[in-house]
Amino acid sequence: MPLHNLTRFPRLEFIGAPTPLEYLPRFSDYLGREIFIKRDEVTPMAMGGNKLRKLEFLAADALREGADTLITAGAIQSNHVRQTAAVAAKLGLHCVALLENPIGTTAENYLTNGNRLLLDLFNTQIEMCDALTDPNAQLEELATRVEAQGFRPYVIPVGGSNALGALGYVESALEIAQQCEGAVNISSVVVASGSAGTHAGLAVGLEHLMPESELIGVTVSRSVADQLPKVVNLQQAIAKELELTASAEILLWDDYFAPGYGVPNDEGMEAVKLLARLEGILLDPVYTGKAMAGLIDGISQKRFKDEGPILFIHTGGAPALFAYHPHV
């Protein structure tokens, strides 16, 4: 088995059973194409989401190092920060979150509702900054201050996206391959590509398990030129950890994130409304709505490699719907 080295890494069991992989009949009829969805928005902690897969590995490493505090960073409405805070609460750890306001809004819902509200419920220590211009350095500086206060901090990068965290999505590729075996031959897989760990982990796993399936990352914050090296660097780092080769081409579409990260656009919001009305499934305006807009447009523009079944990776994010009201 090509991914046997995964078992060498300590991992906490937060998720348990595989998340559902479902056919979307009404959405498929609407688009004239077989569409399946991997429902990582229903992972069983803090309103779900993809970051829990990464945190299974990262939190295990934190405990191995004897940490009593998890430190991470993100936007005020970060799904990753929300899930990190929930994991810290579950494990009896302190959590410190370095937050920015990337869209510069003064809207009360954005500043206090959605993920930000949940951070308070998880008793998170909030540190605000003007901007996460160099998040790795800023997190290390914060960790130094926290350590000086007598804590034992463990730094988790933005999005949980380092080689260790991204192993969670190599593991997810295993899950997907097992669920598809004998049931459906997926032609294309679509995922939101942001901090790059989910995309890179899937790239490594699917290359070895479902090599005939193309993986397309729809960017949510950067151009292809800026995003490609982030994904490739992580892809290679993951492969090195697992003692594998990783030669699959990284495919990115950057036509759907304008006007910028965290700012809803019409195509993304239409995708959110469409899936809600047709399937009762909630996307979000920052990540999955824009990724689904890419899938929808990709079908109409014939951007996929063929007309076979498409799998959409639902990474979560529904709490942001409340933060972005009345835009949704």
UniProtKB/Swiss-Prot annotation:
Quaternary state and interactors: Homodimer.
PANTHER family given in the database record:
1-AMINOCYCLOPROPANE-1-CARBOXYLATE DEAMINASE-RELATED
Could you say which protein family the record assigns here? Belongs to the ACC deaminase/D-cysteine desulfhydrase family.
Q: What is this protein called?
A: D-cysteine desulfhydrase
**NCBIfam families on file:** ACC_deam_rel (TIGR01275), PRK03910.1-1 (NF003029), PRK03910.1-3 (NF003030), PRK03910.1-5 (NF003032)
EC number(s)? 4.4.1.15
What domain of life is recorded for the organism?
Bacteria
For the protein in the UniProt heading, the enzyme class is lyase
Could you cite one Gene Ontology molecular function of this protein?
D-cysteine desulfhydrase activity
Q: Which CDD domains match?
A: ACCD
Q: Known Gene3D superfamilies for this protein?
A: 3.40.50.1100
Question: What species is this protein from?
Answer: Shigella flexneri
Q: Which residues form the signal peptide?
A: none
Taxonomic lineage of the native organism: Bacteria, Pseudomonadati, Pseudomonadota, Gammaproteobacteria, Enterobacterales
Q: Which SUPFAM superfamilies match?
A: Tryptophan synthase beta subunit-like PLP-dependent enzymes (SSF53686)
- Keyword Nucleus on this protein? no
